Amino acid sequence: MNTASSMGDHATIGRYETFSYLPPLNREEILEQILYILDNGWNASLEHEHPDRAFEYYWPMWKMPFFGEQDPNVILTEIESCRRSYPDHHVRLVGYDTYAQSKGHSFLVHRAR
């Protein structure tokens, strides 16, 4: 009888933010989450960090936050640019709620290998 989980070894794999127990999101699913961030009126931003330092609270920001950006394809293009520039880093998309002054949404869009 095989009792191995199809999700892998949950005890040794680092978990980060929303969706961490799901398989990696594809391009369309990431686009849906970008639309969710924009539909809520939040400002999107990208952060990246090397896996060795991924559990530190602050991650370096990729460029500037996308203040007022309403085109999800612009954000998706920046995600791809960040992935190419830092292939050995985790990349996280953040939706910042300026009214509550906190993160409204945050998840990994790229997990380093």
Swiss-Prot record:
**What biological processes does GO assign it?**
reductive pentose-phosphate cycle
What are this entry's molecular-function GO terms? ribulose-bisphosphate carboxylase activity
Tell me, what does this protein do in biology? RuBisCO catalyzes two reactions: the carboxylation of D-ribulose 1,5-bisphosphate, the primary event in carbon dioxide fixation, as well as the oxidative fragmentation of the pentose substrate. Both reactions occur simultaneously and in competition at the same active site. Although the small subunit is not catalytic it is essential for maximal activity.
Please give the subunit comment from the record: Heterohexadecamer of 8 large and 8 small subunits.
Using the record for this protein, list the coiled-coil segments as residue ranges, or answer none. Answer: none
Q: Keywords of this protein's UniProt record, alphabetized? A: Calvin cycle, Carbon dioxide fixation, Photosynthesis
HAMAP family according to UniProt: RuBisCO_S_bact (MF_00859)
Stored SUPFAM superfamilies? RuBisCO, small subunit (SSF55239)
Protein family membership = Belongs to the RuBisCO small chain family.
One of this protein's Pfam families, by short name? RuBisCO_small
Q: What's the name of its gene?
A: cbbS2
**Something else known:** The basic functional RuBisCO is composed of a large chain homodimer in a 'head-to-tail' conformation. In form I RuBisCO this homodimer is arranged in a barrel-like tetramer with the small subunits forming a tetrameric 'cap' on each end of the 'barrel'.
Under what name is this protein listed? Ribulose bisphosphate carboxylase small subunit 2
